[in-house]
């Protein structure tokens, strides 16, 4: 089977609009966006659209790892595939980051971008620093440091992350309202056919599960133990059906080998083809995930969600936990006392909302491009949410 992990589409049930790179001749400047991980694709799709509406040329590169390529193809992005996942282990990761940075340099020399933009792409940060291209680095996990002694020109993060956790001066630290997922979740439109596509009955209580990211630098083996304990806890409830979203084919094979009886009796299933992750979350009764993006997507959709992530808890997840939108599970006992495995009352569609996060991020990028810093190192420019400058 050609396994693909489900994706987070913005408008399920319809073909995404093709997003082209703007031509080289440009009125307002050129922005280079690097897609380093799968969640970055749906995040940047509306940003690219907004930048192109403002007549900015956008060049897109992507790393061939996890589901980045599949997602970029789904959204019909015009991108150049550069580099791949380097595997587990600190030395291999560092070597892989540096090697991909070198692979990105020809794109910089050819395209001559005015600004390098990413969501935590360390390879892009290294390459742009070496080529003296100013960088706009977005991040929502304060414990993921950019690089030792290499910092972006501007760093933008959700406003719930405290200023004191960031390495740069206040004039270089920008912020936006809400969380990263608020950039694209407000555009989501539900497609009710998802349950029948997965062979689920309307009366089934559905839990969507996302295993921990074993290859991530922040991975804690306790997350794996908690995931297995959660499956054992849930499989004892006859009304529950478990939909699992593995991160890759290797993880899918491990799941089938670990719980063959649950797959054979239909208790647990992996989607056979690409499905819309947001749509699956919306039509689930609750979510249990070791991945931050799926947790926050569920929180944005007001779907009950339980986190089995056992790394350092960042400010965004702490904020969601304090506001009752995310439940943090610390041990197997929490499975018994905190999870409420029942049907939820699901409205016909999510609550409508305007993405203040999207407009804030785009306006800051535009202010950066309009300033003299990007192309000639000129004076500071004041923006509505702060000052962009040296």
Model-found features: residue ranges?
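A nucleotide-sugar donor-handling region in carbohydrate enzymes
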Residues: 10, 19, 156-223
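A short, glycine/small-residue-rich beta-strand->loop->alpha-helix junction that serves as a flexible
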Residues: 33-45, 216-218
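Conserved nucleotide-sugar phosphate-binding/catalytic loop shared by glycosyltransferases and other
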Residues: 35, 52-96
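Catalytic donor nucleotide-activated moiety binding site of glycosyltransferases and closely related
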Residues: 75-87, 232-271
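Donor nucleotide-activated moiety binding/catalytic core segment of transferases
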Residues: 100-104, 249-290
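Conserved nucleotide-diphosphate donor binding/catalytic pocket of glycan-assembly enzymes
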Residues: 114, 119-182
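A donor-sugar binding/catalytic signature common to diverse glycosyltransferases
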Residues: 115-122, 127, 137-138, 279-316
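Leloir-type glycosyltransferase catalytic cores
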Residues: 170-201, 323-390
């Amino acid at each position: 089977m050609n396994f693909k992990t489900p994706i987070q589409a913005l408008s399920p049930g319809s073909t995404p609009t093709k997003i082209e790179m703007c031509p080289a001749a440009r009125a307002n400047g050129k922005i280079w966006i690097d897609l380093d991980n799968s969640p970055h694709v749906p995040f940047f799709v509306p940003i690219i659209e907004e930048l192109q509406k403002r007549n900015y040329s956008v060049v897109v590169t992507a790393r061939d790892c996890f589901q980045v390529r599949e997602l970029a193809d789904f959204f019909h992005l015009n991108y150049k595939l550069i580099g791949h996942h380097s595997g587990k282990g600190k030395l291999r990761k560092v070597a892989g980051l540096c090697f991909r940075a070198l692979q990105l340099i020809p794109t910089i020399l050819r395209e001559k971008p005015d600004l390098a933009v990413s969501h935590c792409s360390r390879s892009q940060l290294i390459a742009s620093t070496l080529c003296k291209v100013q960088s706009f680095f977005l991040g929502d996990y304060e414990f993921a440091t950019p690089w030792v002694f290499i910092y972006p020109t501007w760093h933008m993060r959700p406003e719930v992350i405290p200023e004191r956790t960031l390495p740069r001066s206040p004039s270089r630290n920008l912020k936006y309202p809400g969380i990263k997922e608020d950039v694209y979740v407000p555009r989501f439109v539900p497609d009710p056919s998802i349950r029948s596509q997965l062979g689920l009955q309307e009366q089934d209580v559905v839990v969507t599960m996302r295993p921990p990211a074993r290859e991530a630098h922040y991975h804690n083996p306790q997350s794996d133990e908690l995931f297995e304990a959660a499956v054992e806890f849930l499989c004892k409830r006859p009304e529950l059906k478990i939909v699992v979203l593995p991160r890759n084919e290797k993880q899918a094979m491990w799941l089938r080998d670990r719980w063959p009886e649950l797959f054979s009796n239909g208790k647990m299933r992996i989607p056979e083809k690409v499905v819309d992750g947001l749509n699956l979350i919306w039509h689930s009764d609750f979510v249990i995930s070791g991945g931050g993006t799926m947790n926050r997507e569920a929180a944005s959709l007001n779907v009950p969600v339980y986190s089995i992530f056992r790394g350092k808890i960042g400010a965004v997840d702490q904020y969601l936990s304090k506001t009752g939108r995310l439940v943090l599970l610390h041990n197997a006992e929490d499975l018994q006392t905190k999870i409420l495995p029942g049907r939820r009352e699901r409205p016909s569609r999510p609550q409508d909302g305007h993405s203040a996060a999207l407009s804030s991020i785009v306006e800051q990028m535009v202010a950066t491009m309009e300033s003299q810093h990007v192309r000639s190192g000129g004076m500071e420019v004041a923006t509505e949410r702060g000052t962009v400058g040296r």
